[in-house]
């Protein structure tokens, strides 16, 4: 069986353009996440209250972020994308959350095949309200669960590209350690 984290290419035009694997569709209040051992999606939780994902949410294959998971990505698109679907995306910014004292980066991207979003190159060019919605979603859903989180200002595309490059390199390091038997996922 193919594993979506390990066996799917992140793309050929990295780091700016990449393939994102969607875990959670736009508008969902079910938080799915990758089950690392099996590669299947599992239901992590149902979000408290009437709070819904403001974008398609997933990860970039063959990346390993500082939170020891694949690198998270929010893909702006007109439509909800089915879980485990691949979508071509372009990084336009990054939002960093401080969750339990740990840094958790969320790449902000646009679907390159969606005519409503494909021309955006920088998050700052989006309507200000859309950026506010992205930030508030993560603040609100954590607070509704009784957790404190700090959502930092959204940074430009060049910051996202650096994080993507580092996460791709960290994945290769992890892969080499796994092959040698020196690490566990």
Residues of each region from the PLM?
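Hydrophobic N-terminal alpha-helices or hydrophobic patches in metabolic proteins across all domains
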Residues: 1-185
């Amino acid at each position: 069986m193919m594993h979506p984290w390990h066996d799917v290419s992140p793309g050929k035009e990295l780091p700016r353009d990449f393939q994102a694997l969607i875990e959670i569709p736009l508008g969902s209040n079910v938080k799915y996440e990758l089950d690392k051992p099996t590669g299947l999606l599992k239901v992590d939780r149902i979000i408290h209250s009437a709070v819904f994902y403001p974008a398609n949410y997933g990860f970039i294959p063959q990346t390993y972020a500082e939170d020891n998971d694949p690198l998270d990505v929010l893909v702006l698109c007109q439509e909800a994308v089915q879980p485990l679907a691949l979508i071509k995306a372009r990084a336009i910014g990054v939002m960093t959350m401080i969750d339990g004292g740990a840094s958790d980066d969320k790449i902000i991207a646009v679907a390159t095949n969606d005519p409503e979003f494909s021309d955006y190159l920088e998050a700052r060019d989006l309507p200000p309200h859309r950026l506010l919605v992205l930030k508030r979603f993560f603040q609100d859903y954590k607070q509704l669960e009784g957790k404190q989180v700090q959502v930092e200002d959204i940074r430009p595309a060049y910051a996202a590209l650096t994080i993507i490059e580092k996460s791709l390199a960290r994945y290769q390091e992890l892969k080499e350690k796994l092959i040698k038997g020196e690490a566990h996922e």
